[in-house]
């Protein structure tokens, strides 16, 4: 990594930090506000980087790092811009006695004209997070409402203007915001709520910009054996696998209890099937009719089915261009003897390294329906043609016999001429 230190729009050090090791965790979950976290171990041979004051070189009062990921001779990628949140120097102190003519220390342990000089060497552990933390810290002092006529694409950039530039992908739709909308305290959560109205999400780009994007879309990369794949792991858990949704409310007229429920009637999780009965309960005083209760139960069921996924833990060669939220395809060898391809969304990324980058680990959520379909396919079959190789003994069916054994002394002499 190449890491530059900035504060207040000015470069603090003329040279990049000497990074001994580093790690990164990027999370793209629905409820995550600050998605990227990084840790660095920085060499400090002169002992000058360990912070004492809040505005020292690696101090926590607004110091930012511009992180560039260099990939051998293949160029470089602006990985991110992050803000330092913690620093911890680990120092080694040495001392020596030097001549200092005229130096007299009363009751000192050294003779006159001698002085002890200390030198400090250190490594500094630095933790940092992406720039959304500034928006998360900048809470509203009083309730805020959008201006009349505001839309998703006008209000979100306005809320975040003090902290970063917002860039919308071309496929992000726009929508008007209700005039009665009120935001209190949490600025970043208000931004999340605004984007959720059109099904969009945000993530921070390599130049410190906020990218607003739509989940889904076409895969941007295929990872498979002999093409970057190191390993694939997966696991299953029965936790949270519901098959019935029961919604409760109260009649507006007399306060009597309302109950409505829907079940899964087919598939491996069907109600009263081998999985058993696993109901989920939801109660709200806002539900005042059976129709409302039933409609919400259907919604909960559909949301569950849409979220049902197989999570793959994928290790690959260094991939600095990948971001949480990207769609990729993972090629997995299966027991049938071929590779199947599972499309999925990256929900988290882990990277790290020392003097060189190490493998990238990504967690990929693959929709259960896509996995079920992929397991029934044979992708290699599309490469079958009617072209056949030359017919030689080694390609003949076994029923044709085998090449007879011939020794040199059985070959006629004129064949050797």
Language-model region placement:
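Acidic, small/polar-enriched beta strand-loop surface segments
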Residues: 1-13, 192, 196, 206, ...
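Assembly/oligomerization scaffold segments
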Residues: 1-146, 193-199, 203-204, 213, ...
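Amphipathic, non-transmembrane alpha-helical segments in extracytoplasmic/periplasmic proteins
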Residues: 33, 40, 128, 143-168, ...
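Glycine-centered loop/turn motifs
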Residues: 60-64, 149, 184, 226, ...
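Exposed loop/turn and edge beta-strand positions of beta-sandwich/beta-sheet ligand-binding modules
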Residues: 78, 122, 241, 340, ...
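Surface-exposed aromatic
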Residues: 172-181, 309-310
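Short aromatic-glycine-enriched beta-strand elements
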Residues: 360-362
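SH3/SH3-like beta-barrel fold
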Residues: 364-366
